[in-house]
From Swiss-Prot:
CC per GO annotation: plasma membrane
Protein family membership: Belongs to the UPF0053 family.
Disulphide-bridged cysteine pairs: none
PANTHER family, per the entry: HEMOLYSIN-RELATED, MAGNESIUM AND COBALT EFFLUX PROTEIN CORC
Keyword Repeat: yes
Gene3D superfamilies: 3.30.465.10, CBS-domain (3.10.580.10)
Location of the CBS domain: 72-131, 137-194
General function of this protein: Plays a role in the transport of magnesium and cobalt ions.
Protein known as: Magnesium and cobalt efflux protein CorC
CDD domains per UniProt: CBS_pair_CorC_HlyC_assoc (cd04590)
NCBIfam families, A to Z: PRK15094.1
Taxonomic classification: Bacteria, Pseudomonadati, Pseudomonadota, Gammaproteobacteria, Enterobacterales
Amino acid sequence: MSNKDTQGTDKINRKGFFSILLNQIFHDEPKNREELLVLIRDSEQNELIDQDTCDMLEGVMHIAKKRIKDIMIPRTQMITLKLNYNLNKCLDIIIESAHSRFPVMSRDQNYVEGFLIAKDLLPFMKHPEDAFCIKNILRSAVVVPESKSVDTMLKEFRLKRSHMAIVIDEFGAVSGLVTIEDILELIVGEIQDEYDDEEKVNIRKLKKCIFSIKALTEIKEFNDTFETNFSDEEVDTIGGLVMKAFGHLPSRGDHININGYNFKVSIADSRKVIQIHVTVPENKIPKKLEK
């Protein structure tokens, strides 16, 4: 038998196998998506498929209805670099955020020039005397509309071998970003990597008295951690507290003393404060944080 005949037989066998499998699971052909979902759940109840398989099948069914706008990281939460940043400034933000890919914004912050992958900075760390120009190591950015369907986006990620895309609104303005991980998590559930635990922690100890705080950390969490009593009547987050104390949007490196605690902006852009370093008075560090 020729290879061509063998391949044809294999295809028939595979088709027959899946037909038998589907017939065993779905005795009655579903008429619509809702009936199909019911049959999938019934199959799990009858132990024809396990819980994980059921969840993944449901996830695949649901992503067809979703748009990129539903799952994207909004622009206000994007951590970005600027085209005019030097090597040290890029490294500071990369180390502070622990991300691996960064949108690089134009000088006026109106559009994305491309993506920077953290590993592309390694040669410059070994040879810092080499001239560094962020534009020379940029990767091209995939740009998609908010209205794009999630399942189509997944296919595009696969075809273009890309992991991240910039999302724009109907007027062409940047509204957020989406990653392949965001989509896969809709199917298989949350994906843990070596940085996930660190990224989810809002308050991280750097030195004996210095802590890194995400600006979106709620004041209540800050108070519970440091046994303080900052008011959350007018603002909800530490970033809001710092901006209120400054009376304007502070820049990276700006610092201010609030009730004996020194708040220094470690990451910020033209729209928001992203990360803050807090120096706690030595005599006010709770015992649970002394280790």
